[in-house]
């Protein structure tokens, strides 16, 4: 049985590879849209849509989809649109608690199996000056929340309560449990 990751995220690829999984990378192509409004439902729905999009082309394979967002001060924050948006996001997160949500979906069409789940991790951003925020804005345009705490030069996050791998993009504790229960 073949495992496919429906994502081109370097962080997800690295986390799964480090954990010893062998898989193909076939990213989902469609826009990320959902009708849900709550963060945990949004990430589960988007992860499922990504997994189904790829699984439709590879029905005998087990396909993994994932989606990450940041929730802070009542706002859902995805990837920044541009450098100005990244700076606006970083100002919102500055010196604040936020929650990082990642939804995971595992689908195998031929086996008629589908699992979904999500992880939520609380993070505290340190207080940074406008100069420091400008320095890091635009560095992480492909990441929800416009930051990458796994990078040594990213100084935004000072405290994590929960799964560090969730903040990076794939909650490995959840994924390992789900894939085992899935029978892979």
From Swiss-Prot:
Going by the entry's taxonomy, the superkingdom of the source organism is recorded as: Bacteria
Where does it live in the cell?
A: Cytoplasm
A Gene Ontology cellular-component term: cytoplasm
Q: Which reaction does it catalyse?
A: dTTP + H2O = dTMP + diphosphate + H(+); UTP + H2O = UMP + diphosphate + H(+)
**Is the keyword Acetylation assigned to this protein?**
no
* Matches recorded under SUPFAM superfamilies: ITPase-like (SSF52972)
Any one of the GO BP annotations: nucleotide metabolic process
Q: Where is this site: Important for substrate specificity?
A: 11, 68, 150
Q: What does this protein do?
A: Nucleoside triphosphate pyrophosphatase that hydrolyzes dTTP and UTP. May have a dual role in cell division arrest and in preventing the incorporation of modified nucleotides into cellular nucleic acids.
Give the similarity note. Belongs to the Maf family. YhdE subfamily.
Database matches in PANTHER family: BIFUNCTIONAL DTTP/UTP PYROPHOSPHATASE/METHYLTRANSFERASE PROTEIN-RELATED, BIFUNCTIONAL DTTP_UTP PYROPHOSPHATASE_METHYLTRANSFERASE PROTEIN-RELATED
Q: Which HAMAP family match?
A: Maf
Q: What is this protein called?
A: dTTP/UTP pyrophosphatase
